[in-house]
A protein has these predicted regions:
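Alpha/beta-hydrolase superfamily serine-hydrolase fold, recognizing
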Residues: 1-126
Length: 126
């Protein structure tokens, strides 16, 4: 996600200045703008399902990076990266939100829902 790595997300950190101001590098929060810099402060993170696609030029690499950080810290996480070949098109950033009734959007929502239902069922069984 572009918001998960705002300090060093490169050209795709387009949310940094609007959210933190043009002087974001001078703020006390600057060292804590990337998810991998703050994850150690969390006591526990919930199961996390990440969705991206080959056409997600805004956040594909950062979503994979976030997945790697979550995995390295023992967080139950799953990622689904929709390839162009799956639906014969490059799906855009947040396609499941923009196109929830298209086949790819419906599939993404259904898979995320199944992931969270399984995680909640497992938690309830403990």
């Amino acid at each position: 996600s572009p918001v998960a790595f705002m300090r060093d997300g490169g050209l795709f950190s387009l949310y940094t200045k609007p959210m933190w101001g043009t002087d974001y590098k001078d703020k006390a929060t600057y060292p804590y703008m990337d998810f991998d810099q703050i994850i150690d402060y969390a006591q526990a993170l919930p199961p996390t399902y990440l969705i991206t696609s080959s056409g997600d030029t805004l956040a594909n690499k950062q979503t994979h990076r976030l997945y790697e950080v979550l995995q390295a810290h023992g967080v139950q996480a799953e990622i689904k990266d929709y390839a162009k070949a799956e639906y014969n098109q490059s799906l855009p950033h947040v396609f499941s939100v923009l196109q929830p009734f298209e086949p790819a959007g419906t599939a993404a929502i259904d898979k995320a829902l199944a992931f969270y239902q399984q995680a909640m069922t497992a938690k309830a069984a403990q």
